[in-house]
Swiss-Prot record:
SUPFAM superfamilies on file: P-loop containing nucleoside triphosphate hydrolases
CC per GO annotation: cytoplasm
Protein name as annotated: Uridine kinase
Keyword list, A-Z: ATP-binding, Cytoplasm, Kinase, Nucleotide-binding, Transferase
Single GO MF annotation: ATP binding
Metabolic or biological pathway: Pyrimidine metabolism; CTP biosynthesis via salvage pathway; CTP from cytidine: step 1/3; Pyrimidine metabolism; UMP biosynthesis via salvage pathway; UMP from uridine: step 1/1
Predominant location: cytoplasm
Classification of source organism: Bacteria, Pseudomonadati, Pseudomonadota, Gammaproteobacteria, Enterobacterales
Superkingdom: Bacteria
Amino acid sequence: MADKSHQCVIVGIAGASASGKSLIASTLYREVRERVGDENIGVIPEDAYYKDQSHLTMEERVKTNYDHPSAMDHSLLLQHLQMLKAGQAIDLPVYSYVEHTRTQKTIRLEPKKVIILEGILLLTDARLRQEMNFSIFVDTPLDICLMRRMKRDVNERGRSMDSVMAQYQKTVRPMFLQFIEPSKQYADIIVPRGGKNRIAIDILKAKINQFFE
């Protein structure tokens, strides 16, 4: 049964792939959690809402443009945000970067006072923007993002450097220019220099802490 008295604050963090979104989200989560406890703050990665592709062959899956809004199941994400705001728990999807589809597993996420939502395409969807109490765009130069992405995808996601570069040239950069960068206009706060901008993190942390006063 929904808890109508439950108030859930949604903080959106968007920006290019490997811009430092996840670092900012994890830093805010860790430092705010120390003060308010794990039961009051959580993180939802937009990546968890890539569409299920289990009906496709592996050859077809790798051809998907993962930087286009159509690759995301934003309708399910919207439903889950609305459920959390209504005081209902959700089953967060688990996506496999190796298999390029959702797994059969889910993660149970109980309602929290604050949910940090992070992903590249969050601000491109007006429905998601409507659910956010405030939003952040992490503004990092593309050449830095590319270097970070290559290191991450090769070391953590089993990719080759050639495949990472090919994907960057074919879809990542064009989709950033077409969809992600223009969505910066919808952000309440623009954070330069990525996840190591300590001053910006302290300001954001103070803003989030206001919701617990």
